Amino acid sequence: MITMFKIVRGDITKFRAEAIVNAANKYLEHGGGVAYAIAKAASGDVSEYTRISKEEMRRQLGKDWIEHGEVVVTPPMKLKENGVKYVIHTVGPYCGGVWSKDKEEKLKLAILGALKKADELGVKSIAFPAISAGIYGCPLKEVVRTFKEVVKEFLKVANHVKEVYLVLYSERDYKLALETIGLGDNDESR
């Protein structure tokens, strides 16, 4: 079976994958960035989607916060129109522009947690935003390198997940990501 990791340019709220990942904060507040966009697209009402997310967090984890590597799954609601079956919330590290081995390990946990949950749910395709590269301030190049490394290893052992997408909204970020993994100006995957 062919497996693939692909970097694409687009809007994750309109991306066609069985699961999309939300780069959430530890309390699932969905107050800004991609978390706000996903909540708005899923429900139309961010506060309602936040309420649903918090209820699911308490039900699934038995607490009111997520640690690095933990995930919460919520229904896709309106995102179902794009073929989305699940929204998987994970928490990446806050960098504030400073990258370290500790931040890398926390990001690996966040990515791997979402991938494992998707595999457990029988998902074949999953789309990620650049976790921690936005308002959390981690360098995009480091985030992309970490994604590539984690996904490459995970796809060797995955039972169901066959397609992993890193969806970048801006053309600038998309081009930088392709350059980072040595693809230049094309959209091939490695």
From Swiss-Prot:
Instruction: Tell me which stretches of the chain form a coiled coil.
Output: none
Against PROSITE patterns, the record matches this protein to: MACRO
Question: What residues does the Macro domain cover?
Answer: 1-185
What is this protein identified as? Uncharacterized protein PH1513
- Organism, by scientific name, is Pyrococcus horikoshii (strain ATCC 700860 / DSM 12428 / JCM 9974 / NBRC 100139 / OT-3)
